[in-house]
Amino acid sequence: NILKKRSDLNAIGFLSESGYEENITWNDLYKKVCKLSAYFKTLSLKKGDRVAAYVPNKIESIVSFLACAKNGIIWSSCSPDFGVQGVVDRFKQIKPKILITSDHYFYNGKKINILEKINKVLEEIPSINEVLVFSYNKKEKLNLDNFKDFDEVLNQSELDETFERFEFNHPIYILYSSGTTGKPKCITHGAGNVLIEHNKEFMLHCDIRDGEKLFYYTTTGWMMWNWLVGGLATGSSIFLFDGAPVYPKIDVLLEYCQNKKINLFGVSAKYIDHLKNEKYNSKNLDLSSIKIITSTGSPL
């Protein structure tokens, strides 16, 4: 359902707070998902197995999630700002066979290493037997010893265009409760339910149509990331931002909306409150493309 569209137009756009940008077309997204799903099969990953992802909000994260969904593998992700214990508390419960991660990410002007945490995670989760790593910046070559290079795996894999049908309620991903009352609790979502609910919310509630542009500021550890990915099923393009929402300047997200002519813009209530408290005025930006702003996470 998400990969049904074929086009040389962009399906996903990505911007880092560092200024680094990437895009992927619908056609290339389809090919990468099919190649990664083929690789998963070589590892004997099967329907119902779990893949854990400790990843920034990048295109590779979505490719990985969709490859899992294609094979009936259950996805679960944490954002890299989670500490080792936070990751272990979540992933240890689901006994993943593979961990997907990146070499680093950026936040508030700092380049933060992710790989230095991975060995500690592996010590606590013995079910993980392979780690797949993608480079945050394609201009920077990975230097890996015991882990697999994401791009090399894709380049060497066959194009598997077989799509197996699964039960309507077959699990597509595992999310988690906040962990404020004990350890985070697993919340499993069924694929059919998610697809129908997200299509309803995008197309009926938000009036989103094929070819429009969706941007929600989120991390891979928040349910709004999963929601945003669901927007691809409408034929809309989605846009990702990785980093602090007000770095390198207070209106970096709004400027992104202007430059990409975003139609749906989603943020947390805290972000809107921050703009209000700073008395920010967007009069120097052209935000006329935005037809709906959504907010969640706390009362506005």
Residue ranges of each PLM-predicted region?
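A short helix-loop-beta submotif of the ANL/AMP-binding
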Residues: R50, P56-V84, I94-L99, E212-K213, ...
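Conserved AMP-binding/adenylation subdomain of ANL enzymes
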Residues: L195-K213, G221-N263, E278-Y280
